[in-house]
Regions:
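A short acidic, Gly/Pro-enriched loop at the edge of an enzyme's catalytic core
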Residues: 112-119
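Conserved class I S-adenosyl-L-methionine
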Residues: 1-50
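A short glycine-rich, Lys/Arg-flanked "PGG" loop and its adjoining helix->strand segment in the class I
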Residues: 137-149
């Protein structure tokens, strides 16, 4: 399961997947159990106040609306390519909104910003990029150390569908297409290989993304590997207890519905006293 020379890690560098991230999110998220996530974070921010830390801020999909609402927002991400797009979007904002927003290159597992926050959010399964129990514990400890005594921490994970996290001979079928926001060309993507690793609780997928010209010719092809760790709710509760975090709420989606198999794991947490 080693990376082929032409295979990169997801969001590791400039690629079609980073360029279409916002457009793909706008296409996919509304039809999933993650629908309404931005509004959920906006409501919570109205309750907790500032400052807000977004871990895994990516292109600013969540951070920018929060800043537009008047909040001070700090975004961190490990992907320089995604941060470059976020900074480009920030530069196009009204000066007062841009002044409330900053982006930084940082790893959530070793985060050390020297300040605390009223609200910390880790949207879009960002926590699942921590691939071992040790990394998960380090990440939770780092996040807790940045949390104000009365502050809230929100994590969004997928609740694992067991038929997708075990080895299978079925051919991958997930994919889609959209119009590239800059070039106007059609961009297609599909999961072309899966390497589930249940012993290590990993979902490993190769995603192939292509940009198609007006005559049907393939202009660009990117192959990237997405690796995420899945965890059951019972496992997450134990990790929270070990990290000194109390569960305030546990939802199955961003509408506040109860937990359900195969939906979201939306955790609202507070540092224990």
């Amino acid at each position: 399961m080693s990376l082929q020379p032409s295979t990169r890690r997801f969001y590791e560098a400039d690629s079609l997947s980073t360029e279409i991230y916002d457009a793909r999110s706008a296409t996919i998220i509304p039809s999933t159990s993650a629908a309404g996530d931005v509004d959920f974070y906006r409501r919570l921010a109205g309750q907790t106040g500032d400052p807000i830390l977004e871990v895994g801020c990516g292109t600013g999909r969540v951070a920018i609306p929060l800043a537009a609402d008047g909040h001070e927002v700090v975004g961190v991400d490990l992907s320089e390519a995604m941060l470059g797009l976020a900074e480009r979007s920030r530069a196009a904002l009204a000066p007062d909104v841009a002044a409330r927003l900053s982006f930084h290159h940082a790893d959530m597992a070793t985060l050390s910003l020297g300040r605390d926050f009223a609200l910390i959010i880790a949207p879009s399964r960002v926590f699942q990029f921590l691939l071992t129990t040790e990394a998960q514990r380090q990440g939770l400890a780092a996040l807790r150390s940045h949390l104000r005594p009365s502050g809230l921490l929100v994590l969004d994970l997928f609740d694992p569908l067991l038929d997708r996290v075990v080895p299978t001979t079925d051919a991958p079928v997930r994919g889609g297409e959209l119009v590239h926001p800059t070039t106007g060309n059609v961009v297609t993507w599909e999961v072309t290989a899966r390497y589930p690793d249940p012993a290590r609780q990993l979902v490993v997928e190769d995603w192939t993304t292509r940009e198609i010209g007006s005559s049907g010719e393939v202009l660009r092809t990117d192959v990237e590997r997405l690796t995420l760790r899945w965890s059951l709710r019972s496992e997450m509760r134990l990790l929270f207890e070990l990290a000194g975090l109390d569960v305030v709420a546990d939802y199955g989606d961003f509408a506040g519905n109860p937990p359900a198999y195969g939906r979201e794991q939306v955790w609202v947490l507070r540092a224990d006293e």
